[in-house]
């Protein structure tokens, strides 16, 4: 495998008045192209902050993030945005779908914003919604979908630009257990089909174990790394 993402000694300090709070305390790890990785940790352990830095949505106080061979902190904000829009996908605990638009329109939106023609954008969105099992729900608005269906739409939207890496922050936090398991199975299936890497942060050890590799975060540090041979077991 080739290195997709490299993190070296990532530290993040927030200052309020004279008080410094160190949220990340020197995080280092790599992700290979097409790899499925989870980071497990309780609320407040630094997982979401790390994800924001990896997605070029926030700056590290210290350390370096290289994505596709580029040092994120060395890029201008415009170049960061261009890299983010083309090579990264995002899935959150709350789906953040646009309430007045259908599932098809929500998935097509990133392409339309990027200047793709409406016909092409809708064709790509339709193909992805079919892939996530929602061909019968394309014309429904978010309020007409179940929680699991809304999150499937959010995943399809994250994939529509054909990113190299999807960053998922508690993507099943609002779903019941069985639906959450189905969403993780979907991510594995999409990974196998497209070789898109996934980095998922969660507090649920059982769900995290569905990824190829799990890392554990505690108090701003990766405290251990557990490898699972799920691919060989499944094969």
Swiss-Prot record:
GO BP annotations listed: lipoprotein localization to outer membrane; protein localization to outer membrane
Broadest EC class assigned to this enzyme: translocase
Subunit structure: The complex is composed of two ATP-binding proteins (LolD) and two transmembrane proteins (LolC and LolE).
The entry's keywords: ATP-binding, Cell inner membrane, Cell membrane, Membrane, Nucleotide-binding, Translocase, Transport
GO molecular function, one term: transmembrane transporter activity
Coiled coil: none
Family the UniProt entry places it in: Belongs to the ABC transporter superfamily. Lipoprotein translocase (TC 3.A.1.125) family.
Protein's job: Part of the ABC transporter complex LolCDE involved in the translocation of mature outer membrane-directed lipoproteins, from the inner membrane to the periplasmic chaperone, LolA. Responsible for the formation of the LolA-lipoprotein complex in an ATP-dependent manner.
Record EC number: 7.6.2.-
Entries under SUPFAM superfamilies matching the protein: P-loop containing nucleoside triphosphate hydrolases
Binding site for ATP: 41-48
A Pfam family reported for this protein in Swiss-Prot or TrEMBL: ABC_tran
Membrane topology: Peripheral membrane protein
Name under which the protein is recorded: Lipoprotein-releasing system ATP-binding protein LolD
PANTHER family: IMPORT ATP-BINDING PROTEIN (PTHR24220), LIPOPROTEIN-RELEASING SYSTEM ATP-BINDING PROTEIN LOLD (PTHR24220:SF689)
Compartments in which it is found: Cell inner membrane
Source organism (scientific name): Vibrio parahaemolyticus serotype O3:K6 (strain RIMD 2210633)
Domain ABC transporter: residue ranges: 5-235
Any GO CC annotation of this UniProt entry: plasma membrane
């Amino acid at each position: 495998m080739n290195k997709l993402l490299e993190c070296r000694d990532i530290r993040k300090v927030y200052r309020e008045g004279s008080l410094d709070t160190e949220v990340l305390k020197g995080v280092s790890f790599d992700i290979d192209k097409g790899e499925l990785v989870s980071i497990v940790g309780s609320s407040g352990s630094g997982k979401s902050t790390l994800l924001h830095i990896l997605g070029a949505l926030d700056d590290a106080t210290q350390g370096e993030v290289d994505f596709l061979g580029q040092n994120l902190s060395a890029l201008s904000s415009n170049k960061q945005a261009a890299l983010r829009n083309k090579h990264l996908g995002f899935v959150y605990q709350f789906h953040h779908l646009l309430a007045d638009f259908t599932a098809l329109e929500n998935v097509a939106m990133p392409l339309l914003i990027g200047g793709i023609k409406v016909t092409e954008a809708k064709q790509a969105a339709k193909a992805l919604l079919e892939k996530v099992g929602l061909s019968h729900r394309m014309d429904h608005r978010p309020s007409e979908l179940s929680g699991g269906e809304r999150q499937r739409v959010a995943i399809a939207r994250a994939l529509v630009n054909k990113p190299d890496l999807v960053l998922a922050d508690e993507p099943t936090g609002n779903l019941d257990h069985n639906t959450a398991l189905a969403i993780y199975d979907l991510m594995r299936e999409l990974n196998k089909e497209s070789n898109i890497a996934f980095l998922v942060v969660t507090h649920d050890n059982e769900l995290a174990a569905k990824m190829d590799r799990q890392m554990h975060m505690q108090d701003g540090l990766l405290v251990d790394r557990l490898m699972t041979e799920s691919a060989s077991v499944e094969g």
